Amino acid sequence: MEKRPLQTSNAANIPSKTIEEMYQKKTQLEHILLRPDTYVGSIEKHTQNLWVYENDEMVHRAVSYVPGLYKIFDEILVNAADNKQRDPSMDSLKVTIDPEANTVSVYNNGDGVPVEIHQEEKVYVPELIFGHLLTSSNYDDNVKKTTGGRNGYGAKLTNIFSTEFIIETADGRRLKKYKQVFSNNMGTKCEPVITKCKASENWTKVTFKPDLEKFKMAYLEEDVVALMKKRVLDMAGCFGKTVKVELNGTLIRFKSFRDYADLFLKCAEKSKPMPLPRIHAKVGDRWEICISLSDGQFQQVSFVNSIATIKGGTHVDYITNQITTYIMNKVNKKKKDANVKAHTVKNHLWVFVNSLIDNPAFDSQTKETLTTRQASFGSKCDVPESMLKDVEKSGIVDTLLSWADFKQSKDLKKTDGTKTQRLRGCKAEDANEAGGRNSEKCTLILTEGDSAKALAMAGLSVVGRDHYGVFPLRGKLLNVREASSKQIMDNEEIQNIKKILGLQQNKEYTNVKSLRYGHLMIMADQDHDGSHIKGLLINFIHSFWPSLLKVPSFLVEFTTPVIRASHPNKTITSFYSMPEYEAWKERLGNSATSWKIKYYKGLGTSTPQEGREYFSDLGRHRKDFIWDDELDGNAIELAFSKKKAEGRKIWMRNFEPGTCRDHEAKLINYKDFVNKELILFSRADLFGSFKKKLYKEIKVAQFIGYVSEHSAYHHGEQSLASTIIGMAQDFVGSNNINLLKPNGQFGTCNLGGKDHASARYIYTELSPVTRCLFHEHDDKLLEYLNEDGKSIEPNWYMPIIPLVLVNGSEGIGTGWSSYIPNYNPREIIANVRRLLNGEELVPMDPWYKGFRGTIEKSAKEGGYIVNGTVTEIDEQTFRITELPIRKWTQDYKQFLESITDGAPNVKDPLIEDFRQNGDDAIVDIEIKMKPEKIATILQEGLFKKFKLTSTISTSNMHLFDAEGNKKFDTPEQILEEFFPLRLDYYEKSKEYILGNLNRLLLILDNKVRFILGVVNGEIIVSNRKKAELLIELKEKGFTPMPRKGKSTKPQVAGANDDDSEEQEDAEPETASQSVSVEGATWGDYDDLLSLPIGTLTLESVQKLLDEKTEKEKEYEILSGTPTTSLWLKDLDEFEKKLDELDLKYAEDDRKRASQGSKKANGFASKPAKKPPQPRKNTKKAKSVEPENDNSSMEIENAVEAAKPAEVAKPKGRAAPKKNIQKEPEDDIQSLQERLAAYNIESSGEKSQAMESEEVQQKAAGKKQNNKRGGAKKKSSTIVLESDSDNEVNDVDDDDDDFEEVQQKAAPVKKGGRKPAAQNAKKAPAKAPAKAPAAPKKRSVGTKQSAGQKLLTDMLQPAEGTGTSPEKKVRKMRESPFNKKSGSILGRAAAAKDISPIADCSAGSASNTPLSEDEVVEIAPQPARARPQRANRTQMKYALSESESEEDSDEDAELSDFEEDDD
């Protein structure tokens, strides 16, 4: 057809055609010949790098072939292979390729094609399946087949593209042999020739002559023949030894698929220095795998039902993904910064896969890529663990690590610096000559922070700016040896240092000529953090440019003094280390006191003037680092490389305290820096609690400030807050014994404590059990650390049992990681008793307070399996009531959501729904499973499927013992290590107490003799010179008792007064005060000469003699008590406290159960589950707060004294028994002493009467509270407990001083109640018999707090109270109602939110006798709906004789409503 000139070839520009010419119908045969690429692939010649078989070996080379021709050969070959799946007895496959005759024949034995006429198609079956399109035996998809045929084309395509096609088959069952010839592209067929055969004959043979003209070829070319031969070898590899495969009469011998893969690997090894690995595995009957390594590009050879999938597919991905995931995790675990992805691992693998897949699907008729989904494979192939480990050991991990290093180096090169004179975009004070001709003379000073930069800038005024530059570091430099390339790339400090110095990545430096600076000076604080910064900088240079450290004077250090001593004569001495200072002080002896000492914590302590002084004497402060040998590099790696972890542990163990480098030396080699400076390391919350005497609650935020001040804590408030909160947490999985009380929201098991409130809103105080664990007598015996000349917290504490076993430990330190589970404190106590009694220890297993699951030993040494709790409600519904330790409720809820039907991105849901019925402390989750998943879940295991099991290991118990780090294999080893050290401290404690008692006896003896001497006139004190009096006292044999000098020990609880800070700042003694005669000083007799005049009486002498007798008896008892008995007594006391805690927790659980709201209806039809039972207690005990007494024996007596007073039992029902707790105070005075101090007359009879009245009032109040009915109103009495005279007001404004005492309300219409004495006569105290407690009518947990009752009473009118004025008494101290933070209204409002712990720990009233000077009563008033301002209750007090009426009125008129709210 002619086209119009310069026109397109669309239909409009071509001469018109007839309809018949435009729209044609082709037969299927014509269509195949017209569009062959749809069926057999391209019929054009392609050139591609492929594997071919020639000269008896596999060769990978460029091959020129026609894909269509290769495919028609492959179809016949796959047909023969399919017969193996239909008839496993097939054992022979023979292929003949004759290029000269252009003939190919394929023979296989086994069941032949049935020689029988098809009843529907009326032709013989061989003709049907080889000469009719779309015929197949594979159309029934309900039947799972592992054959290659699928679409009904196959051999017909070979017939169509052949000039001659001959089918021969022998059917032994029918005793017929069949032969038929097709020609002319299946267009012509001859009649079949059928002859007889033997019954043993079963075979099929196909011979064809390709129509080379269709493939634009003249003959069978060499490349095509080589491909065909390789395809025959494929069959031999897939069959292995089950089928004998012959090619052109030669048997191909392969025993397994591995032998076949070996042909490829032998060829690849020719260009390799080392042989390639061959990792082979056969998984079931359907999968055979072989793995080797590739050169950065993924390679695969794979087969599906003997079909060569040259482009892979889902079966290859299935195997490869398992291997890549495993190797990727291993590589990234070995080098966290590798950031290796799965595709990177894949590029280094060579995978061989031979598989049988049910009814396989491919991307096209050419069948180059399998597309069947993994779920439809018909079999699973989990790559064996042994094979994965062999792949890991094959060298692929090292290859990937090298690749990661190369990639990182390539990325880091992008941040290289250059030698330029002008530096831009960097926060550096650049030297004027940097990057220029004199750059080698320039020094870059790296300072620790901006404050140190200011000091360096002051020094530059001395040395000038031409050759000195300054750059401040923000915090510690990154440890580049263990950091990822992304971390290094994103680290601004590192990039700036590279730019300023002009460093180029991985460049070998033999000199500094190519750098912008010739020297790098480190100017850091002279403390452990400063040493670490220096080490990290050295590590940075050594990691990337180790050659630079060998350049002389490249790296230098600028040292500053840590202490400067100045003398009044203007002499100044500087010290660069603490040992140097200590040696100097020891040399000077007492004369050192004339020197003024200044500690330099950091460079910021130095003034600009001192900075200029430093730089004026630069040679004194500059130290050069030198490289001696490779030991220097090894030392740096030892300190910072993760690979050297084991060596670092040995290095740390060999450390000897007191080690330090010589600060006088001008040169420092790197190994000395690492081994003598960098190795030094340092450790304060419990100390602050003891020193603060934290027996009353304090806000955590305020406590943080106290701890920071008194323990020299330098690591940030947030870290300290986390530690304090962690010490107070008591939910399951946290502490078995919390050392601090959690008064507020300190976190729950919902989020593992992360849901705690801010430190600004929560309060804490010392737990009653803490001081039983850490005895006061040990405070003076511990070794205290020193910070800036101030003694701070102890180096370590000495509890009576190892606390690390009680609460466990987990963390990472320098060189070690450590994990120690929690253990039962009672089991630990029992084992300590066994050690004290010389018995064998009983093995201990992990134990967590409140945990209701199980902890069982596993087969692994030192391993335990932790299981939660799950119960079956019905066949479909289960209830989870406990999770494994440290698996938090919120996290578990997210897991359940990920397997719940209907949730987004859930592929295989296991449950229909779940419901949560628990609270902040209880786990209660109902799960409704999908019915079709129940069998699978139960088969695989309910605990495993729902992640209700975890493990605990005791194989990594590293701890610091008294000498340093040590590894323990069992908790019993820790106990055995602890025992002798603790026993030794009990011996020291006993000696210390006896020494104090002996000193006290001497003081008492001196006082008795002195007072008698003054009374009898033998010693005249008045109107005499001090020197004469000192001589007389010495001559009369009075023992000098020098005052103890100001202790360098910290002020711990009970050791010193709280005003110790004021004492430290006190003025030194004047000359008149420091009189000295014949070696005796005025202070030696201070106990005698400072006695008040009122004590110089015979009564005082008798009192002192009684006290002396008591102390002598105490001395005798203690000296005769074995050390082990002291420990046993402390253990008994500690166990009593544990009993009290258990009783409290049981009460909390009971309250929670009774107060809990009704649970939502569950999934099951069964009744709702009962609330969780309270924790099991081994023993009931009464709650007693700790006392600050002076010995173990006194503590035991205090426990007895603190028991509730006997209550006079009123008529009718007995009042319920009530635990009355006592607020812990130091040195509580008796009632008589307090009355005596205020000069108030008091008799025993009056005190007894008042005590009896108080007891009777409490009992009556309880009785009335239990009655229902609103006719009578309750009244409350506030008891204001007196603080000790020397107590310093705490931050909390003594909020805890208010306690409630129940009192029977007086009738409204009658007058005041009778005096206390009369009431006492009517209700005498009864004998101490235990009466059964009457049950309370109201529900648990609804008890009103003191604050709530006060608020109710305050809102009632003041008239007609009916309360006797005799009972309104004022406490003898400043009224607490004038304190802004202590308003009763505010406390009453706050009392509504009292936590359960606080509620249980606070008693209703003090159990000590109360005098009239201590009771304040607010009278009950008739209720009003809305009280008006004019009618508010006024506080009225009875006056003591020493107070004025005006003061009383002024105080009484201050209403709580006028107070400021805090």
From Swiss-Prot:
Homodimer. Belongs to the type II topoisomerase family. Abundant in proliferative tissues. It catalyses: ATP-dependent breakage, passage and rejoining of double-stranded DNA. This is DNA topoisomerase 2. Keywords: ATP-binding, DNA-binding, Isomerase, Magnesium, Metal-binding, Nucleotide-binding, Topoisomerase. Transmembrane segments: none annotated. Residues 1040-1077, 1147-1462 are annotated as: Disordered. Eukaryotic topoisomerase I and II can relax both negative and positive supercoils, whereas prokaryotic enzymes relax only negative supercoils. GO terms for biological process: DNA topological change; resolution of meiotic recombination intermediates; sister chromatid segregation. The record marks I812 as: Important for DNA bending. It comes from Pisum sativum (Garden pea). The record marks R760 as: Transition state stabilizer. Control of topological states of DNA by transient breakage and subsequent rejoining of DNA strands. Topoisomerase II makes double-strand breaks. Residues 1240-1250 have a biased composition (Polar residues).
